[in-house]
Amino acid sequence: MINKPNANSHFSFLNSATDEILPSIWPLLEQGLWKQADPAAFEENTVVGVLKRGDWKPVIKEFIPFYREMRWDEASKSAYDPTYIPKIAKTDWGSVIDAASNFFNKYQSKRIAVQLSGGLDSSIIIGLLTYLKIPFWLVGMNTNRYEFRTERHIQELLFPLAEGAILLDFDTHLPLSQLLEVPTHQHPELLSINYSSENAMALTCEQLGIEVLLTGDGADNLFAEALPDDPNLCPWIPQVFSDPWPAEYVYAPRGVELVPFFADEGFMDAIYNLRRGQSEDNSKWWARKYFERILPLELVQYDYCADFWGLYISGMQAAIPTIKSLFDQAYRLTGNFLFSPKSTEALFSQDLLEAKKEMYQKIEARTAFAVWLHGLKKKGITS
C-alpha cells in the first residue's frame, strides 16, 4: 500500500488500480471525477451491506472508501475489516466497573451526554454513569406514537438520573427529511438520508455545550451474538460499533465527538470473558440479568424491540416530491437511466406500504446518490 490513511479523518480513499491511499478526492471531483460515478455499483454495494464493505465495488471510477479501522492485505492487494481479538482474563462485576470507569475517565474534563433511546443499550450506559456518580446529560429522540410507548416509559424513568434531559420530536425529524440540507460529502453515503435527526441532536448538543455524545452502537453484537470459546474467532468488526459518516459530517462540525461506548476495548474484553462460549441471545436476557442492579426493573423483566417502520414510511411519503426532484436533477447531470422519469415512475408506483427490503434498498441507494450529487452541485463542482 502506498501512503498512509488520513489519521485526521474517518475516511481516506483507496485507488484500487494502484493501491495508493489518498487522504481526499476533492481535487479529483473538482476536475470532473464525479462524472464517472456509477449509481448501479452503489446500489449493489447497498445490497452487499456495510458488514461486507471490503467486498464493495468502486463507485467513483477505481476509488473505494478506506475507513480508519480498515487494514490492508498485501498478499491479496485488498482492504479488509479486522475482527477484534479479546484478551482472556478472569472477569467479574468489579472488572466491568473498572473497564467502564477507565473509559469514562478519558472524558472526565468534558461535558458528556448519552444518546437516550429508551432501550436496553443506552440504559446500561446511563446505569454505569449513575453507579459511578459521574454527571451526564441525556439527548435523544421521542415520539408519541403508540408503538414507542415502552421506550417513552423508560425515558421518563431515566430523566431524573441526569443533570438535564432534552428529547426532540422524531416526527419533526423523520427519516428522509431535510435531504436538500445534507452536508456536501466526497462519496455517496447511505446514512446521509437520516441526516435530519442526527443534525437535530448535534445542534442540541452544541447549544448545551455537550462535547461528547455516547451512543449504544455495537451492544447488539456484544450482548446478542453467539461468542466462541476461541477469542481468535470473535466476530466483532469495527463497523458494527460506529457510524463514521454522522460522526464526521454532522457532529464534528458542531464540536461534538460521537463516541460508541461499547467499542471500548476494555469493556469489550470484559463482556467477552463473561459471555464466552454462550449461544445467540437476541433478546439479550443475559445482559438484562447481569446489569439488573443498575437498570429499571422493566428492562430486567421484559424484552421488547423498537418498531421504526411507522416513522420510516411517514418520512418516505413526505419526502417523495423532494426525492423525485433530486432524481430529475441527477438525471440531468448524469443521463443515467436509474434516474430517468420512466425508472422513477416504476420505482414509486409500487406499494410502498409493503416492507420489501429489495424495493427500499433501491429507493434508499438512489436517494443517497442523488443527495450526494446535489451536494456537489451546491459546492459548484457539477456546474
Question: Each PLM stretch: what is its role?
Answer:
Residues 24-30, 44-55, 196-203, 245, ...:
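Short, hydrophobic/amphipathic alpha-helical patches that form generic packing surfaces
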Residues 46, 99-103, 128, 157-158, ...:
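Amphipathic alpha-helical segments that form well-ordered structural scaffolds
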Residues 142-203, 220-236, 271-279:
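ATP-dependent adenylate-handling ligase core
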Residues 92-100, 150-151, 193-197, 283, ...:
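Hydrophobic (often cysteine-bearing) scaffold residues that line and stabilize catalytic clefts
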Residues 121, 218-220:
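Catalytic metal-binding/acid-base residues of hydrolase active sites
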